[in-house]
A protein has these predicted regions:
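N-terminal alpha-helical targeting/anchoring segments
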Residues: 1-32, 50
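TRNA-recognition modules of translation machinery and tRNA-sensing kinases, especially anticodon-binding
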Residues: 28-221
Length: 221
């Protein structure tokens, strides 16, 4: 279907570049300590014996990980923290959604057909979600929503699944580009004329999390 292969039209303010090296710097927050003191996340976790790659490979294969003890607790705490901030301070409504969806849902959020090779397909023509955006967005698919009830703001924490077939040659060290991971996702259903304002608002919501954790970051375009 040719229509399914036509991408969304970028906003006219989006810069044109050959790849991420030509992204534009917008702003940053915080200070990064000297690189000579920085260790990778997997090195720190292995030294503390709170992560297990070998056992994960034994039971599931490559690109899986087992979190142990304080690291498993940290993951749970961060998920709860982010959900609380987004629901109590940022105005999002929390949902618990399915991680298995039908093919229409995958097409409806642009995962298919372009990213087919990066998805996990089940035998019954259902799919494991690569992000809870698929489930959250499709809650309103084929629906007519009263203009006055917008915006709708959804947040969910789910397991996400990605085959990462296109990740060959990219950074896959440690917990990067895993087949299974947990993610807190924000979705806004918004009036078209307010889309850019809502995008800025969502970026601000994400920034708030990093600021509360005192983590340095950059905003790029």
């Amino acid at each position: 279907n040719i229509l399914m292969s036509i991408p969304n039209i970028p906003d006219e303010n989006i810069p044109v570049g050959k790849d991420e090296t030509e992204n534009l710097f917008i702003k940053d927050y915080g200070k990064i300590i000297s690189k000579k003191y920085i260790k990778s996340h997997d090195e720190i976790a292995e030294n503390l014996n709170i992560i297990d790659f070998e056992t994960a490979v034994k039971i599931s294969g490559s690109r899986f990980v087992i979190l142990k003890d304080s690291l498993a607790k940290l993951e749970r705490a961060l998920i709860s923290f982010m959900l609380d901030v987004h629901t109590q301070e940022n105005g999002y409504k929390e949902y618990s959604v399915p991680v298995i969806v039908n093919e229409d849902a995958m097409y409806g959020t642009g995962q298919l057909p372009k990213f087919r090779e990066d998805q996990f397909q089940l035998n019954n023509n259902q799919w494991l979600i690569p992000t809870s955006e698929v489930s959250l967005t499709n809650m309103v698919s084929n629906s007519i929503i009263d203009y006055e009830k917008l915006p709708l703001r959804f947040v969910a924490s789910t397991q996400c699944f990605r085959a990462e077939a296109g990740a060959a040659g990219k950074d896959t060290k440690g917990m990067i580009r895993q087949h299974q991971f947990t993610k807190v996702e924000l979705v806004s259903i918004i009036q078209p004329e307010f889309r850019l304002n809502e995008l800025d608002r969502m970026v601000g919501c994400a920034e708030l999390i990093l600021q509360k954790l005192d983590l340095p970051y950059r905003v790029m375009l």
